[in-house]
Amino acid sequence: NRTWLHVGKVKNFLVTSELSKRFGTHDLRLGVNEWYYHLDYHSSSLQWMASVQEYPQLLHSTAVDPLDPTLSSQRVQTYGYNELSPEYTKGYENKLALYFTDNWQVTPRFNVYYGGRLEYYRMSADQISASRFPGFHIGDFNTYSKDEETGNIIATPHSIQPAKVVKNKLNYAATLRMTYNMTKQFGLTADGTVATRFPRINEYAGTGPTEEQYKRVTIPLIRGGLFYKNNWLNLTSMVTYISKSNNIDQQNLTKPGTKEGKTVLLIYNIQTLGWTTSAEIDPFKGFHLHALFTYQKPVYKNYNASVTFDDGAQMSVNANGMIVKEIPQVLVELDPSYNITKDLRLWLSFRYFGKTYANLQEALYFNGRWETFGGINWNVNKHLSLGATVINFLNQKGASGTINGSELITKEEAGNYAGRYMSGNYLRPFTVEFSAGIKF
């Protein structure tokens, strides 16, 4: 198993100033955003082993500390210090933007909303671009290894120091939405948005992008559909296309069947085509139902990575056209609630997540699952509110998320892992929580 320890301090300041004015059928806004964000962050990583049982126990193993000049074997519970993607960055980013919007009622039935935003972006950050390895840390030091032929201990000097990276860029965004009411209750709507940005300070916490990898991220969105409204139903159905270019991600690649892992920096694209239908239903006084259904197909584009392990073995992963891991293709939300009185409310929440892939190459997956919640909220008076929440009241069991160390496993190899224990995240168990809020 792997554990990351994070330490960070964030300071930020945000202010918005806006002017608005109506001119005939136009509702105009003109504004300025100023946002300052300072980050001082670092993390470290380690690995450990535990028994597989109801109450797992930490296990001891034999390991060699690469910082030990004698390379003596030690009996330890943790090992592989900072082998896997420890992070560090310190610096700030500042965004100063001018934006405008216009809500234009062209005719009583036809509405056009459009706007734009231009942002000056400045970033100053410390970056450590050196590849990570066991015993990695800031400073001047040696690591030690043993020559396989002679048995001699070899000292390798390292000098790990952060370097300052400063960027000054312009980002932009634009949006256009058109709505046409065919009747008082039924209408059509379509909108498009494009937004851009450059890599942010947090993306320099790992090895960070090189100058060649520092590219503009572009996010276009196009959607269209229809809506229907009356006094008890608000129904919307939309088809959406969205993509994102030049994503930056650190991926930990583990050699299958071993504990050895390497971290690589990836730059790739994602695109999604989906259909979403949502409804807000109020059939009688006090009762409300929110319902949503989504079918989507998020896929990787230009996703290729390769890694060389300590024994010289080279392995690669090609996720082009694969479904994005951890993202289900089918989503369902059902949220009924009932106000017994104006101060007493009962509610339930059902979330269905369809089949979800647990690794990059669609080799391992989790079956669909329901996550359920329910509760009661009581506003006793203007000073006191009480609540009770039940989590997972259907007592669903299983795993979700990803499976550590599985990224290089292919569909052809997946059968080799049938019946094996693999680590991941578990569904939150049946839980009852009570809360109280006091206002003065």
Please give the residue ranges for each predicted region.
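Gram-negative outer-membrane beta-barrel transporters
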Residues: P108, Y120, Y241-S243, L265-L360, ...
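Hydrophobic pocket-lining residues within nucleotide cofactor-binding pockets
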Residues: T196, P298, F393
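Residues on the lipid-exposed face of transmembrane beta-strands in outer-membrane beta-barrel proteins
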Residues: V15-K21, L98-W104, L176-Y180, G224-N230, ...
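Structural signature of Gram-negative outer-membrane beta-barrels, strongest in the C-terminal barrel
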Residues: V10-N12, R22-T25, R29, N33-W35, ...
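Solvent-exposed loop segments that connect transmembrane elements
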Residues: N1-T3, W48-L84, S124-V165, A205-T210, ...
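Conserved C-terminal beta-signal and adjacent last beta-strands/turns
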Residues: P220-G224, H288, G321-F440
